């Protein structure tokens, strides 16, 4: 920010990416249903790679924000397609769950380790170097996807017009409240309060207008039928709350370790590693247990218990807490997330029509993004109004309560065994 003389706009470097990604997940998930995943996967890799190069070449802060938004568009497209691709390739849920584990684990590890590795590269080589790493990975991924990923052409959307009005309303319905929440956690909240509330109201208004529009069009961008079942509503509500817990921990635990307990940024980053490193282990255990469950929703209950226990034990941390204890507690939270995150997507795919599987999967990811924005905003407001220490403690209590609610919701979900799906 100092290098580009734009400290006042610094927060929007991350916010711009997040908003662009969250807004587009649902739209690109549905477009994948209509036109196939492979073109969108290739386009997402190209956009992310080009956006990274342009961001690294930015000469001022507005340019950097604009190119981060471009990256976010590619990121949203990537999330929407990669989480749905296993459903196209493996109609059998027993085989699909293994690949869902790999996808979810890769995403979780990248989300946790990416910022830490980026910080190390920035410290060693400068901030521009952090952006020049991604294009190389994007080129390799583009080649592998182009050569080996099959082109599966949907047949149910042939000749039907794209729902442009629904796409616009959906963009406002998702993006406006998220932008409002981001403004609420800005430093000068009072200066933005009116605009933030206006954005939230605009988002709800667009959502209300979206419903009758989607009921009328032949091929809706957001098919309302994916929310007709009780289970789909409960799964997305649980995903919303879990997203809040996950990002409160990822976003604010480093602040607790550094500002309250006095750890160095490097030490705090290393202590956070178990949270994301153990998620794949939980996902692999989930993949082994899931086919054996007559009531697979019990794994959601197990995940919420582990996650809630980890949040509760996090409140025991002090400046004198031994490293092994911090690792055990954060590993417990990571294990819980490993049981929750892949199952939300898999269960939504299991109860949705094949023609809607992209929209259903994308909805889960969007709800997680909404939950993360809401959770981090509420804790951010608590920190701003009280203090860092007290605000973080309130945030952890909030996480425990959310985990209890997720556990209760999970008991109300009734899923059939994957062997029968």
Residues covered by each model-derived region:
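Hydrophobic transmembrane-helix bundles of small-molecule transporters
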Residues: 123-238, 264, 270-271, 399-400
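Cytoplasmic-side transmembrane-helix entry/capping segments in multi-pass membrane proteins
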Residues: 43, 96-106, 159-168, 227-228, ...
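Hydrophobic alpha-helical segments of secondary membrane carriers
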Residues: 90, 100-106, 165, 238, ...
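Hydrophobic alpha-helix/TM-entry signal in multi-pass membrane transporters
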Residues: 41, 48, 64, 100, ...
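Transmembrane-helix bundle of Major Facilitator Superfamily
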Residues: 1-148, 315, 381-385, 396
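Short helix-kink/termination motifs in transmembrane helices of multi-pass secondary transporters
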Residues: 8-11, 15-16, 20-23, 37, ...
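12-transmembrane solute porter fold
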Residues: 14-16, 51, 125, 192-195, ...
């Amino acid at each position: 920010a100092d290098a580009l003389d734009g400290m006042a706009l610094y927060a929007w470097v991350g916010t711009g990416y997040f908003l662009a990604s969250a807004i587009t997940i649902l739209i690109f998930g549905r477009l994948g249903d209509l036109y196939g995943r492979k073109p969108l996967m290739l386009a997402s890799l190209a956009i992310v790679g080009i956006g990274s190069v342009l961001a690294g070449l930015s000469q001022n802060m507005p340019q950097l924000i604009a190119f981060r938004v471009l990256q976010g568009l590619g990121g949203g497209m990537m999330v929407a397609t990669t989480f749905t691709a296993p459903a196209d390739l493996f109609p059998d849920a027993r085989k699909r769950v293994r690949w869902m584990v790999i996808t979810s684990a890769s995403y979780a590890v990248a989300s946790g380790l990416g910022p830490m590795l980026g910080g190390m590269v920035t410290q060693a080589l400068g901030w521009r170097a952090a952006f020049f790493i991604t294009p190389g990975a994007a080129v390799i991924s583009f080649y592998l996807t182009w050569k080996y990923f099959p082109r599966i052409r949907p047949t149910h959307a042939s000749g039907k017009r794209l729902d442009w009005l629904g796409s616009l309303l959906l963009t406002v319905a998702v993006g406006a409240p998220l932008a409002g929440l981001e403004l609420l956690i800005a430093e000068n909240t009072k200066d933005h309060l009116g605009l933030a509330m206006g954005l939230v109201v605009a988002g709800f208004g667009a959502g209300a207008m979206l419903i009758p529009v989607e009921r009328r069009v032949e091929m809706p961008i957001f098919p309302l039928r994916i929310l007709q079942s009780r289970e789909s509503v409960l799964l997305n509500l649980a995903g919303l709350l879990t997203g809040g817990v996950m990002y409160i921990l990822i976003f604010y635990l480093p602040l607790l370790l550094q500002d309250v307990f006095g750890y160095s940024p490097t030490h705090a980053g290393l202590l956070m590693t178990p949270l994301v490193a153990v998620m794949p282990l939980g996902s692999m255990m989930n993949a082994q247990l899931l086919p054996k469950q007559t009531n697979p929703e019990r794994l959601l209950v197990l995940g919420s218990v582990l996650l809630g226990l980890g949040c509760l034990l996090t409140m025991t941390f002090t400046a004198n807490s031994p490293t092994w204890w911090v690792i055990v507690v954060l590993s417990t939270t990571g294990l819980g997330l490993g049981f929750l995150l892949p199952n939300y997507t898999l269960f939504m795919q299991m109860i949705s029509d094949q023609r809607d599987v992209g929209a259903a999967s994308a909805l889960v990811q969007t709800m997680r993004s909404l939950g993360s924005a809401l959770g981090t905003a509420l804790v951010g407001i608590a920190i701003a109004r009280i203090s860092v220490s007290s605000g973080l403690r309130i945030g952890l209590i909030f996480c425990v309560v959310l985990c209890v609610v997720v556990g209760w919701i999970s008991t109300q979900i009734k899923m059939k065994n994957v062997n029968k799906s």
